[in-house]
Structures are given as C-alpha cells and as structure tokens.
UniProtKB/Swiss-Prot annotation:
Family matches, as CDD domains: AAK_UMPK-PyrH-Ec
Subcellular location: Cytoplasm
InterPro entries the record matches: AceGlu_kinase-like_sf, Asp/Glu/Uridylate_kinase, Uridylate_kinase, Uridylate_kinase_bac
Family: Belongs to the UMP kinase family.
Pathway in which the depicted protein is active: Pyrimidine metabolism; CTP biosynthesis via de novo pathway; UDP from UMP (UMPK route): step 1/1
Biological process terms in GO annotation: 'de novo' CTP biosynthetic process; UDP biosynthetic process
Gene Ontology, cellular component aspect: cytoplasm
Assembly mode: Homohexamer.
Protein species of origin: Gloeobacter violaceus (strain ATCC 29082 / PCC 7421)
Summary of activators and inhibitors of this protein: Inhibited by UTP.
Enzyme class, first EC level, given as a word: transferase
GO molecular function: ATP binding; UMP kinase activity
Record's protein name: Uridylate kinase
Gene name per UniProt: pyrH
Role, per record: Catalyzes the reversible phosphorylation of UMP to UDP.
Amino acid sequence: MKYRRVLLKLSGEALMGDREFGIDPEVVKSLAGEIARVVEAGTELAVVVGGGNIFRGVKASSSGMDRATADYVGMLATVMNALTLQDALEQQFQVQTRLLSAIEMKEVAEPFIRRRAMRHLEKGRVVIFGAGSGNPFFTTDTTAALRAAEIDAQVIFKATRVDGIYDSDPKFNPQAVRFEKITFHEVLVQNLRVMDSTAIALCRENNIPILVFNVFEKNSIYRAVQGEAVGTYVC
C-alpha cells in the first residue's frame, strides 16, 4: 500500500454521471464501492465533495446573484452530495462514515473539528467533508487542499472525468499530450487549470502532491492507492 492517508476530491459533476443535473444513484453506488475497497485495504480516506451537479455559485453570481449568497447555496449543495455518498457507503457497503460540515447543522452532520476528524480516520472511518471551507469566495478545490493539510494527508486524489492533465483540451485537440508528471510551478505558469491557483499554492507550500485521474476507469481509486501509474502526478 503506497498511501496511508488520502484526501479524495470528488467533483459534483462526477456524481451526476451522464445526466445534465442532479445525482445518478448508480454512479454514487459505484464510487462508494471503490471507496469501500480502498478502506478495507487499510488506507485512511477523507473525501471533499463538490456541488456543481446541483448549483454553481460562480455561474449564479455572473447572472446577478450576490456572490457570497451564491457560494453559500453551493455549500449547501455539497452537503446534499455528502449525505448521498454517506448513505451509499453505510447502507450498501457497511462502511463506517462521519460527515463533518464547515457550517453548523447538527441534525445532519458533526461540526468540523480537526482533531475529531483525525481520530475518526485513525478508527478506520471514512470522513466526508461538507459545506466547503464554510467561507464564500473559496472553491471546493481550495477546501480539498486546506483539509488535506489539516489532516496530514499524504496526497490529494483529484477524481475527474479525464485521465490526467493535458497540454491542451483533448476534446478540441486530438494531438493533445498528457503529462505523466508535472510540477506545481509548471501548472501555474502554463495555466493548466488542474485546480484554482489558491489550491495549487496551498499544496505547494505544504508539499502535498496531487494525482489527477479518471474516476470512471474501473478500480482507478484502488490502483492509485496502490501506487500504480494512473493519471498525472503533480508535485
């Protein structure tokens, strides 16, 4: 086992599968199964979930909505996704989980307390972080970098729809080249949009590498934990 403690960043879009909006139960079940396998193998796993399948604060603010308000709505969307993932893990795979929210909502989640999160991980529970960082103007990518630093994660797995980072968009350029390994500096200089610049800066300052890979490839999360060559490694 290459990694002992991992922070998995799941985009909201990953949860909707081929749909244009919302949550695909079959996709959630598949992801929960992958997570369960990783935990059973002995890796401590925390998850940050996005909310873009339900609401995107940046898009709403560009349409005239107050940016801070839009971001708070987006945070609530992440909690909806987190609850859905939690239910799949517990009901279908009998994996112990804890949902920790950056915004207090004691009826559905524990408040985020760093030491509590780390104790849950040590006990083999999957820790799901909801409500982003609790602050507007910050993305869930930045939340992933922040939480990874706080819980001493060895790596961030950024699970996406593509199999790594390319020098240009492979959707529009068939000759696009995929990087196997790239530095934080190169990501920023080339504006490759792996994560936003705040998240990249946090990872660079705290020496937390990022592995970007296609979450829809079978066993991709498990293979990544084992140290197999999947996706693009950013360090």
